Amino acid sequence: MFHQVWAALLSLYGLLFNSMNQCPEHSQLTALGMDDTETPEPHLGLWYFIAGAASTTEELATFDPVDNIVFNMAAGSAPRQLQLRATIRTKSGVCVPRKWTYRLTEGKGNMELRTEGRPDMKTDLFSSSCPGGIMLKETGQGYQRFLLYNRSPHPPEKCVEEFQSLTSCLDFKAFLVTPRNQEACPLSSK
């Protein structure tokens, strides 16, 4: 009798614990797909880097000196090519321009980007529950991180909280939010 009561109490405790510690299902991480007839048009234009998550702080260290980053995604000169230009505003106020070329590759129905000149780097795009938001999962040599971008430089705080909650459930415990205290640097046209 004692064992049955004890088992019932443990089961009740387990149910209560699980109901309070709910992580979203992995299926809530929705990959953005694109087939050969579609264009990446919904993803073109300006994006602001908001936050990042990784397993370790070292995987986010590249963003430590950053105040804000603004990106412009444009169609490339070749099919299935994207041009990404960015301007990084460091915490010390310096503007650092960057540019990358991405190739859209076949990735099991999801939109997978490969960075030219970086064969080890893969980027997957995921939808975000945040209006105007998108999540990227970057995988490279020795790192894996999720990055949150938004069309607005200052999305609702709830967006950042949901991103942190989701990535924490995926065991990405290191978290970084860009301060975005300074004005974004102008994007160069080159």
From Swiss-Prot:
It is found in: Secreted. GO terms for biological process: cholesterol efflux; high-density lipoprotein particle assembly; high-density lipoprotein particle clearance; high-density lipoprotein particle remodeling; lipoprotein metabolic process; negative regulation of plasma lipoprotein oxidation; reverse cholesterol transport. One of its GO terms (cellular component) is high-density lipoprotein particle. Its main location: secreted. Tetradecanoate binds at E138, R145. Keywords: Disulfide bond, HDL, Lipid transport, Secreted, Signal, Transport. Residues 1-22 form the signal peptide. One of its GO terms (molecular function) is antioxidant activity. Disulfide bonds join C23-C169, C95-C185, C130-C159. Expressed by the liver; secreted in plasma. Probably involved in lipid transport. Can bind sphingosine-1-phosphate, myristic acid, palmitic acid and stearic acid, retinol, all-trans-retinoic acid and 9-cis-retinoic acid. Interacts with LRP2; LRP2 mediates APOM renal uptake and subsequent lysosomal degradation. Belongs to the calycin superfamily. Lipocalin family. Highly divergent. This is Apolipoprotein M. It comes from Mus musculus. The lineage of its organism: Eukaryota, Metazoa, Chordata, Craniata, Vertebrata.
